Amino acid sequence: MKEDNNTSEESGRINRRNVLKTVGAAGLFAAGSTGMAAAADSLSQAEEPKLLTGTEKRTLARELAKTPAFRELAQRARADGAQIRSDADSIVAGYARGEDFAREVVQYDLENLTDAAEASIVIGRNPETGEIEVANLDYYYETDDGVLDEVHRFEPTNASETDGVQSAATSDGATVIAVDTDAIREAQNSEIDVDESSPSNAAPTPADIDITGCSACKYAAGQVCTIGCSAAGGFICGLLGITIPVAGLSCLGFVEIVCTVADEYSGCGDAVAKEACNRAGLC
């Protein structure tokens, strides 16, 4: 794992996400089913996910910060020496609704980290029932060459694991989420190969989606880019309800590949989704 100096080494990752903060919301993919369930015929639908701003964002952030789940995770972060950032840009909030799916999620960024590249607390609530459905404290670690290596996740007491793909426990109680570093590095080192023939802006319907195939990958990639890479992977996966592997990767690893390609294209669209899924080996 890479030692973080909180200046130059961290800035590359943060700057990349800031560049994509606004273009992500202008993604060209139509909204539709985005949550991936375990079976091909069972898709959780998160329609028209959107980021909140202004009063809506502040109100939701204050509400979720009062929950026991947030307080427990914040206490854990403070025990690690980290602090919750207080500036407005350090909070990301979003909302998604669909058939049998409704979720509002807030990401609270942390600072004063020891060896992680970045960290955040993510809290997600069902606005209809008030139930907390997502509650994570995630520390993102990178390799010496700046590639996402693994994520150490803490959850509230008695919480169920939400993205435990190839996971293991650490001595401090964190769940280590493997993100397939080699696949991410290969994606970051690949050259853009734009195929401009027969572009299509139409999103597949749930009946068209093969959960393990190219269509599912491109659809998920489009929704990730629509949310935007200013947010951490834990926020994006929580908002969209993606809880199983996409393209054989954990959701966190998949998000990293999509954001790498979106950064190279400086935006979103069919070409980004196609290129990301090509690099993931599904298209």
Swiss-Prot record:
GO biological process per UniProt: defense response to bacterium; killing of cells of another organism
Keywords linked to the UniProt accession: Antibiotic, Antimicrobial, Bacteriocin, Cell membrane, Membrane, Secreted, Signal
Phenotype when changing residue 74 to V: No effect on immunity function of Immunity protein HalI and interaction with Halocin-C8
Domain of life (superkingdom): Archaea
GO CC field: extracellular region; plasma membrane
A Pfam match: Hac8_like_N
UniProt effect for mutating residue 71 to A: No effect on immunity function of Immunity protein HalI and interaction with Halocin-C8
Induction: Increases to maximal levels upon transition from exponential to stationary phase.
Consequence the record notes for mutating residue 65 to P: No effect on immunity function of Immunity protein HalI and interaction with Halocin-C8
Known outcome of mutating residue 68 to A: No effect on immunity function of Immunity protein HalI and interaction with Halocin-C8
Post-translational modification: Predicted to be exported by the Tat system. The position of the signal peptide cleavage has not been experimentally proven.
Signal peptide location: 1-40
Result of changing residue 61 to D: No effect on immunity function of Immunity protein HalI and interaction with Halocin-C8
Helix-loop-helix (HLH) region as annotated region, ranges: 61-75
Annotated domain remarks: The helix-loop-helix (HLH) region is essential for immunity function of Immunity protein HalI and interaction with Halocin-C8.
Subunit structure: Immunity protein HalI interacts with Halocin-C8; the interaction is direct.
Protein's name in the database: Pre-protein-C8
Source organism: Halobacterium sp. (strain AS7092)
Lineage of source species: Archaea, Methanobacteriati, Methanobacteriota, Stenosarchaea group, Halobacteria
